[in-house]
A protein has these predicted regions:
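Catalytic core of the metallo-beta-lactamase
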Residues: 1-36, 71-151
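Active-site metal-binding motif and surrounding structural segment of the metallo-beta-lactamase
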Residues: 19-65
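Glycine-rich, phosphate-binding/catalytic loops in enzymes
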Residues: 31-32, 57-58, 127-128, 166-169
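Conserved beta-strand edge residues that scaffold enzyme active sites
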Residues: 43, 69-70, 154
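Active-site His/Glu-centered metal-binding helix of metallohydrolases
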Residues: 45, 49, 98, 115, ...
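Short loop/helix-cap segments at secondary-structure boundaries that form the rim of catalytic
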Residues: 56, 68-73
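Accessory terminal helices/loops
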Residues: 131-207
Length: 207
């Protein structure tokens, strides 16, 4: 979960809040006397839809996501979402899920499950590997080198990197052709295969 706030205007936005974080987030907003302007979701998975969406709507702000669902606010590429005297720019970045979004604010981008720092794509299979390649290379890696990328999943305790670092060193995208990437992703195990081969007591990575 990420929180951005304009303290002068007393408005805030939360990005990808997890259900277990909601009490803490609501306490933080109350303590700082902040009005929640938006709940932003970079992506959602159908098996989490009903429970998660109901809890997010209970926060009292519009829920923004790429997939059109009753009770959510759908946005377009390039749209600006005001937060006090600031705004976040919507970037459509499909691939991890069909409706995956990223949100840019100043020199940083919140990209959720689209890109894990120095790690393979999550799920373990992206919904659309070709779209994922295009989103990473054409939407994220074309941003200024110093742009900070805030991922939705930690890898070795890291969830933040830069465009330059990931463009140069990401094991799935740096110095890779599109065809090589697609072949590599196709060879990744499915959830079912991973579950069959993992020892008891281990968890399958999820997105």
């Amino acid at each position: 979960s990420y929180v951005l706030a304009d303290n002068d205007a007393r408005e805030a936005v939360v990005v990808d809040p997890r259900s277990r974080d909601l009490p803490v987030l609501q306490a933080l907003l109350g303590e700082r006397d902040l009005r929640l302007r938006w709940v932003l979701r970079t992506h959602q998975h159908d098996h989490l839809l009903t429970h998660e969406l109901e809890r997010l709507r209970s926060m009292g702000a519009p829920v923004v996501q790429g997939e059109t669902r009753e009770g959510t606010h759908t946005v377009a590429d390039g749209e600006r979402l005001p937060v006090g005297h600031e705004s976040l720019r919507v970037i459509t970045t499909p691939g991890h899920t069909a409706g995956c979004l990223s949100f840019a604010w100043r020199d940083r981008v919140f990209c959720g499950g689209l890109l894990a720092v120095d790690a393979c794509p999550h799920q373990p299979h992206p919904a659309d590997p070709a779209a994922l390649w295009d989103s990473i290379n054409l939407r994220l890696f074309t941003l200024p080198d110093e742009t900070l990328l805030f991922a939705g999943h930690e890898q070795r305790a890291r969830a933040v990197s830069t465009v330059l670092e990931q463009r140069r060193w990401h094991p799935f995208f740096a110095r890779q052709t599109r065809d090589a990437f697609l072949a590599r992703v196709a060879a990744l195990p499915t959830h079912a295969a991973a579950a069959a081969t993992m020892a008891p007591g281990h968890n399958i990575p999820s997105a």
